[in-house]
């Protein structure tokens, strides 16, 4: 049997060095930040623009539901807005990590801040999810009626806005793991 090296052929593919892997991790970090920005921004906008009005007997008497009626949903909008602003402000550091993949202290700072933002977006999304559940199911013991039978488009929008927020939670978890892996390789 003749191997490819007997014919003078050599492999052109060199193994990927640490610099290439670190740069790849930094590029993935930047991409995940953009995805998380989109998720938190979409969630904040979807929830912040949610309202529905129902006529009651006449056109002069109406029932209205909007996100600002419930402080929990207001907290959800504020939490997603803060996390979105943080993610936008963290983009330059993420770009620095692509250029200088050896930056250690800035990556450590991002781990702590990403963890704090993960806690904030988790608190906002969890609180809003509880209210969305009550809006759909109600609570017989507390005599809270489900409102989604009447305000169906309101409930669809507040339920849909949770998707982006929970997606951003996953992205932040991945960002923390990526940064930890990048630091552990040093």
Swiss-Prot record:
The chain crosses the membrane at residues 27-47, 75-95, 108-128, 162-182. The keyword Cell membrane applies. One of its GO terms (biological process) is cell wall organization. It comes from the Eukaryota. Glycans are attached at residue 51. The keyword Transmembrane helix applies. Residues 1-26, 96-107, 183-186 are cytoplasmic. Residues 48-74, 129-161 are extracellular. It is a multi-pass membrane protein. It is found in: Cell membrane. GO terms for cellular component: plasma membrane. Pfam families: CASP_dom (PF04535). Keywords: Cell membrane, Cell wall biogenesis/degradation, Glycoprotein, Membrane, Transmembrane, Transmembrane helix. InterPro entries: CASP/CASPL, CASP_dom, CASPL. Homodimer and heterodimers. Belongs to the Casparian strip membrane proteins (CASP) family. Regulates membrane-cell wall junctions and localized cell wall deposition. Required for establishment of the Casparian strip membrane domain (CSD) and the subsequent formation of Casparian strips, a cell wall modification of the root endodermis that determines an apoplastic barrier between the intraorganismal apoplasm and the extraorganismal apoplasm and prevents lateral diffusion. This is Casparian strip membrane protein 3.
